[in-house]
Curated annotation (Swiss-Prot):
This is Uncharacterized protein HHLF5. Pfam families: US22. Residues 496-513 have a biased composition (Acidic residues). Residues 496-536, 549-568 are annotated as: Disordered. Residues 517-533 have a biased composition (Polar residues). Belongs to the herpesviridae US22 family. It comes from Human cytomegalovirus (strain AD169).
Length: 603
């Protein structure tokens, strides 16, 4: 789904762009960017982020964040193993949240939002900045104004925006990293309150969550996403309730059962259908766009009806009620390791560098040099006062509020521009051909090799055993036949108890190592010889008995938690093994009704 054009008011967007003015002008030279960040850091100034309120960018140098021994270029950089292509990113600073240091807020404005002041109020001065080395989020700037965010705690790299203007319009509102548990972001979806309370109280097990969902089946929950329109979530609870929604109402029994098997096969564990997200149309039938699924660990996933794929949606009920469908809007902007993505069913990162060679062709003309680039003109065009004007009495006026917003606003993809130099044009310009060829080769070398995104690169011994067992169960002709794969053939441990003895054996070994901890035998280690008849001996024996009882309770809790973790780890291993076996092969997809089957037989 395509996100909205902007999440902040026109005045806030212009104020943020004014704060980014020098970055826009000096983006071609890395040394100028570093010098600018150093000067801002010496002045202790920060730039408020446009959205959401309270977030700011503290300008900090690279050495102060990662240390003097950190590498700034190549695969050894802090983000070198995460980014899709080897690109030189410049550190702008760290992202901090504070409710005490906020920019000056203007009063309510009329529809003519362009009359914001030209005062230099786009920076805030912070007296005390938290230690940058302990900061969790780092903002990075790439070529052609691409903006990245590095989550140091989780080891995840996010592609935030394709330009500084895009970053000013959207801010961090769709950055998944700011909605962590430590931030305690308030819930967006709060109504109906009785349904929300029951869902939050019974999110510990899938059986309790299913019982609550079945109690409210047929009810609609307005699922809210930050900055986007509210979508209705129709609660189902059971698979049979899915047959009353479009297009599943057109599916035959066998086809519907294959779809349910696909859900279980993809998640590698028991699955609950929580509900569907779609639209309630005047036809009286609810049209589903996404099916919300819940696995054994009460983690949420979505099935895209049009793409026929299952991906991760939220880690818990609270996260679902906080971010809504945020992961669907930001699909492909999260860069992590292939094994972890396969275990979590995250959408693999989509390389944004495919546009760079296209943009490079505009700079291959001999007369185009760094001194003649129109960065200043672009900046003035972006901060023009009439950019966000809303005049309802002018029906013939188009502005940046529309989807077709003009060259400097949205038409950033060079492949859709009519002035893009085609191959035939380049062949005709023989005097520039050699220069173009050398320039493209130079830029390709600058980007560096593409990172090998493969599950086989992060293979562990447990995962290797799971892959071997899975390959033995799947007939080779089924894997090599694309027609069978496209018909919905799934690779899965069909039996839940398959090879359980082997897994339990390895798990028991790990459990014995964990339980053989000296702290678990506090009573036996703290005993000292004393006379049996003395008062001190009686008190000591009672104390030892109490310690042994407490240690036994802790041991039982640890074993129970270990058993749950073992079951969940087995599920994650199966998902990674499934991804490894299917790597390079057609992805299994269920068969969905064709639009022809929607029509009545007399048509």
């Amino acid at each position: 789904m395509r996100q909205s054009y902007r999440y902040a008011s026109g005045a806030v967007v212009r104020r943020t762009l004014k704060g980014l003015r020098k970055l826009i002008l000096c983006q071609d030279l890395r040394q100028d960017i570093r010098h600018l960040v150093r000067s801002y850091a010496d002045m202790n100034i920060s730039l408020p982020i446009s959205a959401p309120p309270g977030w700011r960018l503290d300008f900090v140098e690279f050495e102060d964040i990662f240390g003097s021994a950190a590498v700034t270029d190549g695969p050894e950089t802090p983000w070198g193993q995460l980014i899709c292509c080897e690109e030189s990113l410049e550190s702008l600073g760290v992202l901090q949240f504070s409710t005490t240091v906020l920019p000056r807020v203007h009063g309510p404005r009329s529809s003519s939002e362009d009359e914001d002041s030209d005062d230099d109020d786009f920076f805030v001065y912070v007296e005390e900045i938290e230690p940058p080395s302990q900061a969790r989020l780092v903002l990075l700037l790439g070529r052609y104004e691409t903006v990245w965010c590095l989550d140091r705690d989780r080891g995840v790299l996010y592609y935030l925006a394709h330009s500084l203007d895009d970053f000013a319009r959207h801010g961090l509102l769709h950055c998944e990293a700011i909605y962590g548990e430590q931030m305690r972001t308030p819930l967006l979806t709060t109504q109906p309150d009785h349904i929300i309370c029951d869902l939050r109280l019974h999110d510990n097990s899938i059986s309790e969550l299913q019982r609550v969902t079945c109690r409210y089946r047929g009810e609609c929950v307005p699922l809210r996403t930050p900055g986007e329109m509210t979508r209705p979530l129709l609660l189902c609870g059971q698979a049979e309730n899915l047959k009353g929604v479009w297009p599943f109402i057109c599916m035959e029994t066998e086809q519907f059962n294959d779809l349910l098997k696909f859900f279980v096969d993809r998640l590698c564990c028991e699955t609950m259908i929580m509900g569907v997200v779609g639209e309630s149309l005047p036809s009286g039938v609810f049209h589903a766009d996404f099916v919300i699924l819940v696995d054994r660990a009460c983690e949420f996933f979505y099935f895209d009806v049009s793409r026929r794929e299952i991906w991760r949606l939220a880690d818990s009920v609270d996260m679902l009620l906080t971010v809504g469908l945020l992961k669907i809007y930001q699909a492909g902007r999260r860069f992590h390791y292939a094994v972890d993505d396969a275990e979590r069913l995250e959408v693999p990162g989509r390389c944004p560098h495919e546009n760079f060679p296209f943009w490079d062709r505009f700079g291959t003309v001999e007369r185009v040099r760094a001194s003649t680039r129109h960065h200043e003109l672009r900046y003035k065009w972006l901060i023009r006062k009439d950019r966000f004007i809303v005049r309802p009495d002018w029906c013939s006026m188009r502005n940046s509020l529309d989807e077709v917003s003009g060259t400097a606003d949205v038409s950033w993809d060079p492949r859709i521009r009519p002035d893009y130099p085609q191959t035939s044009d380049l062949e005709c310009a023989k005097q520039y051909w050699q220069e173009l060829n050398d320039h493209v080769r130079e830029q390709t070398a600058r980007y560096g090799p593409v990172r090998r995104y493969s599950v086989w690169c992060g293979m562990s011994s447990r995962l290797e055993r799971a892959v071997k067992r899975l390959q033995q169960r799947i007939p080779r002709q089924n894997l090599m036949n694309p027609s069978l794969m496209n018909q919905g053939l799934c690779v899965y441990y069909s039996d839940e108890e398959e090879d359980q003895e082997e897994d339990d054996t390895s798990d028991d070994d790990d459990q014995e190592k964990e339980t053989e901890n000296p702290q678990n035998n506090i009573g036996s280690l703290t005993r000292t010889p004393s006379s049996p008849g003395s008062l001190e001996g009686v008190e000591e024996r009672m104390l030892n008995v109490m310690k042994e009882a407490v240690a036994e309770q802790d041991r039982k809790k640890t074993q129970k938690k270990h058993k749950i973790d073992t079951a969940q780890r087995r599920v994650l291993t199966r998902r990674a093994a499934r991804a490894a076996v299917l790597e390079g092969r057609p992805t299994p997809k269920p068969t969905m009704p064709h639009p022809v089957s929607y029509l009545p037989f007399w048509m």
